[in-house]
Amino acid sequence: MKKEKADKALEKETDQRKQAIDAALGQIEKQFGKGSIMRLGADTRMSEMNVVSTGSLDLDIALGIGGFPSGRIIEIYGPESSGKTTLTLSAIAETQKKGGIAAFIDAEHALDPSYAKKLGVNVDDLLVAQPDNGEEALEICESLVRSNAIDLIVIDSVAALVPKAEIEGDMGDSHMGLQARLMSQALRKLTGTISKSSTTVIFINQIRMKIGVMFGSPETTTGGNALKFYASIRLDIRRIETLKEKEEPVGNRVRVKVVKNKCAPPFRQAEFDIMYANGINRESSLIDLAVRHDLVAKAGSWYSYNGEKIGQGKEQVRNFFLENPDIAFKIENQVRDLNALPLLDQAKIQTREVKSIERDTKETKETKSKQPVSFSTEADGDIAVGE
């Protein structure tokens, strides 16, 4: 009898709490709009994470979700000529292949359209801006994000987002913390909008050295600490080897460390080849992954698939994959299945030709977008850390 009374009392209390929660949710939606608060399972935007491939299968696996997530901020940093811009251009090419729209904010004024074209970027559809100062670059970024029509935005680079006050000042003037305050304010404004618009925003950053560091790494990134906190993924990319063909350098082997990852376990690594002629060598990465997962056997310099030798040395196996895209497709899907990544559609697999190392000498067309500047670099009460 006592147990029945206790159960009824508990059930009544549960109903009252449920009614109170429903009333609170109704009040919040009435005040702030529908969708301002909801149960996590009912929000498909949060439960289903859309991703865009990085262009490197090994890096897609290291990220744990198959690529760069939508609606998030990504930071890619590393030394000079380590492959930062190449990696972002590969992501742009993958976005365009899926029918998405990409934008490149070239604050460094160094984008080479002929090189981008060799990486698979459709330069005719790529939106490019070359702003005059940091405030203008971030205003352009905000306008593109608020349009809800852009899938990927790349900002190259944070170090080149120079505040207007510094540009208008004299050489040698001290502008302590100006860029850090600019980045802090911009990221506070952009983060929520980026999430709602499902736009992936990639910041390329440079490395500086801290003075007087006795223990630990003296390296740090530019633009203060705000980007480190707001970024969902931070990638450290380094060149570890120069690839040569008949004593002539033809590319670099790079190592990417996932320093921070809010979407999957961090601290994983990926290694892949970046060729000067056509960017990330997809076939070379596939060979390494196939050997790692015992899909292709390696004995000395010989590689075998299903008991049959397919080539001596990685270059011969790479040519074998290019000549037999069906086999490459099958192996790649096996690798993807073993790493819980979505499988490829066979219709998308195409044979690619090995291009010679050439650079067009056409001048880059400057596309300057003028937008009203509203980002302030004045102190706003936040602690801003400079370079």
Curated annotation (Swiss-Prot):
Cell location: Cytoplasm
Domain of life of the native organism: Bacteria
GO terms for cellular component: cytosol
Residues the record lists as binding ATP: G78, P79, E80, S81, S82, G83, K84, T85
Entry keyword set: ATP-binding, Cytoplasm, DNA damage, DNA recombination, DNA repair, DNA-binding, Nucleotide-binding, SOS response
One GO process term, biological-process aspect: DNA repair
Family: Belongs to the RecA family.
This protein's name: Protein RecA
Species: Leptospira biflexa serovar Patoc (strain Patoc 1 / ATCC 23582 / Paris)
Gene designation per UniProt: recA
